[in-house]
Amino acid sequence: MFCFFFVFSCESSSPPSPQYRRDGFVVMDGLLSPQECDQLRQRMAEIVDEMDVPDHCRITFSTDHDEQLKEQGNADYFITSGDKIRFFFEKGVFDDKGEFIVPKQRSINKIGHALHAYEPLYKKVTHSPKVQGIAKKLGLVSPVVLQGMYIFKQPGIGGEVTPHQDATFLYTEPLGRVMGLWIALEDATVNNGCLWFIPGSHNSGITRRMVRTHKGTLPLTDFVGREQQYDEDKFVAVPVKKGGVVLIHGEVVHRSAVNTSDDSRHVYTFHLMEAQDTRWSADNWLQPSEELPFPPLYTK
């Protein structure tokens, strides 16, 4: 299904909040220049060239329920990545000995979850005046940065992201306090795996959560609640131009398809939480640490 929606400019004085409240997402053009996008991609290419991942840390990333429990649920490498920069791979990129069978640059699904803290270029974007301005237009008083990730959506093999709500993984009390910013470093199209949303679905709450299990037990995370089935006809495609950003409400249902095209779809994405009068769940897989408390978005 396709629909028409208003695309805001990051230079506009018009607040995006009415559409964000109505649909659960907003597209804004021009957050980054083409040159800034290229700089972020070049820095990421350098990080990948330099990576050295031990065999036992070579796990794949998935949003599928069963695969997620098998891979991330049993992996200390995943659950302790909140204050580190770590690598998560596409399916089918290793042989039975754990060696790459595709070029390293084409093997990675995502890198996370602390790019916003430890990589200067990504930190600069995260705390940029434009990002702070967007947060202020939406009325955020004390936003903090929860995590920062780079998603590759590799050409030909970039994995499907099944329908989900971010609050399943990033739960707060009350709900409605988490927002994702999804920045397209290349054009995101229907062909290379752009996002699809169910407009207005953020008004229906959540039906399941991913939580930490008791210490010393496996898997390290588990799901509570039921996995919702969604009507495919309700999803709308949301293409984004290079340098644009999608603001994503924590409870809006969204997904992306497998990238079967010859084009990658690189994205830098991070999540904010309104910290004022909000409780971050101690059951969430992601937890602040002594090394990296959730940093305030607003800088002096």
Describe each model-derived feature in a short phrase:
Residues 8-21, 29-161:
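Non-heme Fe(II)-dependent double-stranded beta-helix
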Residues 19, 237-239:
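Residue-level "contact hotspot" at macromolecular interaction interfaces
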Residues 34, 169, 254:
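Glycine-rich nucleotide phosphate-binding loop and flanking beta-alpha elements
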Residues 50, 54, 58, 67, ...:
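Non-heme Fe(II)/2-oxoglutarate
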Residues 118, 132-136, 144, 157-237, ...:
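Catalytic core of non-heme Fe(II) oxygenases with the double-stranded beta-helix
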Residues 147-150, 181-183, 268-272:
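A structural signal for short, well-ordered beta-strand segments
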